[in-house]
Structure formats: C-alpha cells, structure tokens
C-alpha cells in the first residue's frame, strides 16, 4: 500500500473512490463526512453509491445524511446496477462508493466486491480499519482485501488511541 495524497477532485477530473473493509470500521460514516466536506467546502459535485444493502436500516440512515447534505445517492446490489449508477454520476467531480463490511477471510465475498469495483471504475480503493485494532487483524485485512487493488488506508479515530 502506498501513501497517497489528499483526494483532489476537480472540474473535468472526476475521481471515484471506494471504501472497503471489515464491518464496523466506519466506512459509511467517513464517506458521508468526505461527501459533505467536498460538497459544502469545496463546491464539488459529489455522488454517493452504496453497495451495502445488507441492512435496510443502514440504507435509510445513509439516505437521511445524503438528503441533509444534498448529495445524490444510488443503491446498488449488482454489477449491472453499478454500471447504471456510474452513468447517473457521469460528469460529477467525486463519486464515493460505500461497500458492505466483509470478513477478510471471506474470499468469495471479496471476489464479488472486486467485480463491483471494476464496474464502478474506481480510481482509489481505501481500506478502512479501526485504529485501535490489533496488528494481526490489520495485517489480515490488508492481505484479505489486497486482491481488490487497495491504494490507500483510512484509519478513523486515530486520535483516540493511546501511544
């Protein structure tokens, strides 16, 4: 995994970024924060796609946030739906892709995720991990999600851990 700079979408330079990782690491809430930041502070046109349909309450909660920040949301479950959602956001500055939490050892689910990310045409795949997780669990996640082309790492709550 390389250290990458900040996301820098701009007019005519669309960037598509997916958040992947185990359940409960903060993928969804951090994508909402990024969407709001780029939409409100940098006046970027932002679209959000969620492929996390495992719990309807999650989609409803996400829709509440995207409505609040006026960020369009597309919900997808298949590669075909992902292609359609990408077409909906053609011309947007930043497209953020939320994915379902997957156990790093679930290679079948990770292969399906990889196919969805190909259809999304992502530029970056951020692996989202808990900053207070064990070194073993982090290494397992890096290895497990490596096949989807991880380009960066996001560690929410980094400021909350003790050194």
What label would you give each PLM region?
Residues 59-61, 68, 77-88, 94, ...:
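Conserved catalytic-core segment of NTP-binding enzymes
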Residues 19, 23, 93-99:
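Catalytic-core segments of thiol-dependent peptidases
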Residues 1-54, 63-79, 83:
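Primarily NTPase-proximal linker/entry elements flanking Walker-type ATP/GTP-binding cores
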Residues 52, 99-101:
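Switch- and interface-adjacent substructures of P-loop NTPase systems
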């Amino acid at each position: 995994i390389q250290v990458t700079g900040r996301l820098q979408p701009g007019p005519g330079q669309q960037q598509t970024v997916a958040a992947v990782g185990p359940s409960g690491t903060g993928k969804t809430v951090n994508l909402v924060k990024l969407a709001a930041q780029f939409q409100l502070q940098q006046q970027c046109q932002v679209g959000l796609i969620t492929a996390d349909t495992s719990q309807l309450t999650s989609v409803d909660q996400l829709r509440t946030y995207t409505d609040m920040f006026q960020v369009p949301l597309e919900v997808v479950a298949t590669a075909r739906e992902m292609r359609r959602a990408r077409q909906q956001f053609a011309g947007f500055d930043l497209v953020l892709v939320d994915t379902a939490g997957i156990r790093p050892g679930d290679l079948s689910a990770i292969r399906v995720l990889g196919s969805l990310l190909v259809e999304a045409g992502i530029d970056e795949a951020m692996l989202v991990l808990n900053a207070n997780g064990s070194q073993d669990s982090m290494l397992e996640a890096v290895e497990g999600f490596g096949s989807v082309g991880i380009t960066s790492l996001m560690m929410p709550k980094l400021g909350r851990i003790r050194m």
